[in-house]
Curated annotation (Swiss-Prot):
Signal peptide: none annotated. It catalyses: RNA(n) + a ribonucleoside 5'-triphosphate = RNA(n+1) + diphosphate. CDD domains: RNAP_beta'_C, RNAP_beta'_N. Zn(2+) 2 binds at residues 809, 882, 889, 892. This is DNA-directed RNA polymerase subunit beta'. Its EC number is 2.7.7.6. Its cofactor is Mg(2+); Zn(2+). Mg(2+) binds at residues 461, 463, 465. The RNAP catalytic core consists of 2 alpha, 1 beta, 1 beta' and 1 omega subunit. When a sigma factor is associated with the core the holoenzyme is formed, which can initiate transcription. GO terms for molecular function: DNA binding; DNA-directed RNA polymerase activity; magnesium ion binding; zinc ion binding. NCBIfam families: rpoC_TIGR. Transmembrane segments: none annotated.
Amino acid sequence: MNELANFANPLASTEHFDHIQISLASPERIRSWSFGEIKKPETINYRTFKPERDGLFCARIFGPIKDYECLCGKYKRMKYKGIVCEKCGVEVTVSKVRRERMGHIELAAPVAHIWFLKSLPSRIGLLLDMQLKQLERVLYFESYIVIEPGLTPLKKFQLLTEDELLEAQDQYGEDSFSAGIGAEAVKKLLEALDLETEREDLLEELKHTKSELKPKKIIKRLKVVESFIESGNRPEWMILEVIPVIPPELRPLVPLDGGRFATSDLNDLYRRVINRNNRLKRLMDLRAPDIIVRNEKRMLQEAVDALFDNGRRGRTITGGNKRPLKSLSDMLKGKQGRFRQNLLGKRVDYSGRSVITTGPELKLHQCGLPKKMALELFKPFIYSRLDAKGLSMTLKQAKKWVEKERKEVWDILEEVIREHPVMLNRAPTLHRLGIQAFEPVLIEGKAIQLHPLVCSAFNADFDGDQMAVHVPLSLEAQLEARVLMMSTNNILSPANGKPIIVPSQDMVLGIYYLSMLKENEPGEGMRLSNMTEVHQALNVGAVTLHSKIISRVPQVNEQGETYMKRVETTPGRMLLGETLPQNYKVPFETINRLLTKKDIADVIDTVYRHTGQKDTVLFADAIMSLGFKYACKAGISFGKDDMIVPAAKEALVEETRALVQDFEQQYQDGLITQQEKYNKVIDAWSRCGDRVAGEMMKEIQMVHKGPDGRELPVNAIYMMAHSGARGSAAQIKQLAGMRGLMAKPSGEIIETPIISNFKEGLTVLEYFNSTHGARKGLADTALKTANSGYLTRRLVDVSQDCVVVEDDCGTERALEMKAITQGGNVIASLGERILGRTLAEDIMGTDGQVAIPIGTLLDEAHIAVIEKIGIQSVKIRSPLVCESHGGVCAACYGRDLARGTPVNIGEAVGVIAAQSIGEPGTQLTMRTFHIGGAAQLNEQSHLEAVTDGRLQFRDLRTIIDPQGKQIALSRTGEVVLVGTDGRELASSRILLGAHLLHNDGDMVKKGDRLAEWDPFTIPVITESAGIVKYQDLVENQTLTEQVDEATGISQRVVIEYRAPRGKEDLRPRLTLMNGDSGETARYMLSPGTVISVDDGQEVLAGTVLARVSRESAKTRDITGGLPRVAELFEARKPKENAIIAKVSGRVEFGKDYKAKRKVIIRPDDGSEPIEYLVPKSKVIDAQEGDHVKRGDNLISGSPDPHDILEVLGVEALAEYLVSEIQEVYRLQGVKINDKHIETIVRQMLLKVEITHAGDSIFLPGEQVEKEDFEAVNAKLESQGQEPAQATPILLGITKASLQTRSFISAASFQETTRVLTEAAVQGKIDTLSGLKENVIVGRLIPAGTGAAMKRLRVTANSRDAALRAANKAVNFEQPTIAIESDNTDTPDAAE
């Protein structure tokens, strides 16, 4: 019965499975797959082209070459199906079986499987506890290994050379011990392993071991032993006796013209194995000398190695053309391998591609499709319509008609295409908006027409770009294309929720021109009653587009009634106002202003939020046409006189030249170093360039009046730049200011700037200097694209299975959000950061009532309420703290940014996050920034109040210095601004030595300066009066006189001192002697400290004793752009990483070592002190006796994310990663919502490391999924046993992708061999829960519409199971029905 069903639908048999398992194949298993043994290396007969019998293409084993025809031709046609020909032994069946039938080779001697030998860590090596080197010596016949020592003093597993073996046999007798060589010996050893006892011994050893490194090794072995026990694999299966041969159609041999053959490399590799195997058999039959047989066995081992993984060991086997042969492993690996080439990327039917051109008269949901393309793409639909209408009798006739292009065909094509969306795609598809659906409009010509507004989503322009068209065939596909992918449904960008359908370039210029207002235009002050009169006045020339007039515009009130409102405006703005949808939340004021590109985007955003999608689409289309029309009417153009070179340029340049000359002189006199001079010169020139640019912008913006008092036209270049249509201030600066500084190829800046601009023209030397940068720019762009693409791929891989799975996980945890400020400027306001997130706490109003309850999804209205109350920090839900299994919940994720509504269940938020972060990757820079000179000036050196309030000091000790200033003494102190109701509004850390301008409890206004400090040095301040004594400060050993470069005043500076052997190390410090009580305080001085007091000098409290230069004041390279983003996502340890205090406590200094010094923190709670070893060259940010808080830097630098996680927890880590990554994107002006970064960080935090096993099966130090860990603990607690303990760990995105549950997903990402080896040993099961696995096995992904199908299947399955159980209970006495038994093993039968 099944046979017949499968014949009708050959795929049916493989459809129902719900997981895939991979494991080692036993020899019996391999033989059971096989249809026969391959004995000869021959392939096909060169004269008859028929396969040789028993050869690699044998028809008897693999099946017939032609359908239903045996090899000799005795049986032909269907009627003989299933008969085996007695003459040639071939079964009569379909030739397709040659794609699925396997053969095998029986090896004359066992060989080791190279994956389990060489894929690190070597599995065979771990099981036998042998080193890989030793194993290889045995396997490749260099040394013997003792298998059973018997009563001899030899050790088991001991290696013996040939001479040693003979000696031992002479000494102890041949039969007293057994030794072997090659894979046979290893196989015996593996067979002899008792895994259960091995496991017990290892666990015992683990309990009693004392050393540091031993447990790691034991745990490694234990894991391998356990995985063999649990998976039911046998260790000896890693040694092969039988080799499977893949079906011949998968390694084809094709005759080329000219009598030659093209063949797959695998045939060569198999042939090599068969040849060596047959020769070995023959030699063994002939009883050849041992040495010859051994050599042949070694060659067989090498041949099998090459077949499985060519080049993994020894020489790579090459073919006739010196090209390495592609082995079975290479077939899977890399971009060209099976996974990425064929399973994850497929070519599709019904697609075409062509050049694109603009279609400004199209509606937003349309695209222009060339008739020729449409005819080809929609052929089957046309045939069926022709048939349905009875126009063509047969399919053949229909084909003819279409080929001849009769006029009926065009009418039918119009019908077929109506309301049938097509999908357009532009490569590279960096985010989901790279494929959108449109309704096709038939056009003449051969180019696809694209709507101008969707260009920014596709990143398309019309300089020869090509796009591909795909036709969704089934009704479901058409429905999804229309509902989900239609361009009108994708108005907002999924990355930041801002509109992506925004006018650009000409449209912006037209709208900007239209919204301009000018003084003294004709008709100024006219009163026009309505739009009709405005049109009339414009047509007769009574007013211009820019005249100030008073008119009335129709508006809608909240009840939806229309009324006329009187406004002061211009005719141009009235025209714009006509396009606005009628809604009381979108009043005329929205566009009654000068509109730049950013403003237009805001208008579209407002319209979308308040009036919905349909109105927005109509508005966008209308505003686009207006923009084009008036850009054309305005006729804006510019000539060289529009580039105004500022008059002040000459003077500014001269002034700077004099300054540079001055620095040069200081350098000649030895007052400043080369580096200092370089920094100052560059600083001076970059300031000069900026000032010239400022002057130029002033002159370009100036509005001049004509003799009649009318304003003359605005400078066209300024209009283009200011409106955001084209160009920027930086580009105008090069045209009319000065080009400024250029970089060398190495990335350093050339000291001589380019003083000319493009209008004046460059000198030869200037031109030459500017060529470096241009060339480097082009080289960088090429590298950037590849790097950015790879980052996106890693991000998608780590987050692909993160899908919204439920409405609310009910977690108690939350993230606290504050506004991000830098130097008193708000970079990202609180409102921006919490918009579209779920509240995790009640928000109290000023009246003490709940203003917004917990669990609210915050929209724009709520944000306004929060800002009005004046709250500074809000707790919200985040994907990071979500406790859903197998995904995130809708409440933790919040708003779906691309729709502006709560996120749907089934949304693939992980992939969206990855695309949102990866897509702008190409806009990031590749270079590392050189900070110094100019950049130092913007180092923050003061603190301002961000809001009105009362000042409070928290943990802040202060002292009045001799000048009467209030100085901060503590490192961890904060100033807090408190509102009238006592609520904390803002808080800031205060640096040591900062001068506080207000006292505790003062009322301050927004913008008041609270504190200021020197951004370049950290002072050492005394807390009491006394006499200073120098200790261990010896001239020319630990102390030196240096002349200050800028002022010429000499200073005493501490230098690094290495004590000679046997001498006591010097520890330079200052002590403060108090008159009555002797020594009161010690101040350790690190190298580079400048001492400000003399030996024996009397000082007052608050005196600065010494100054340490801050790291940030030095010129240093900071990684920026793409490399920085990658570094953060890969969770790499930074080069100069900061050391973080793990506990709060007091600092002490311990003993000094050769290059390190010991810093000890004594915790406040009296627990064990914690010690750190710090390089002496580093500046320690704390003095003896200082109190540090947990998480404070002991040494400045970039913190290591792993430390932050360990010391401060998940929330702090998230905050750090989000802010660091956002900073890079913000520099480039790219907006990405925080939740995307949080989603990726969540995927990096899915694992925990076991610290204490308790009664669980986990091993200490093992990394397990958080979900598994929690499930095991819940089970242990319910049984009253001791649960395991663990700490969260952070994995980089590459590592996290390789450690996902799904081995299919991991194997298709990177390191395919390693992943598959590991999975096979563990007998891993892939439950196909992620997106990637499902794409690979060819199913609907469990996200989006596929998620609904999955849910239905799960409910149906559970219902079936319940029914079956009920039936069993009822029919307990009766035998089960036979038909049912066919499907009982397939849980998916419900489908």
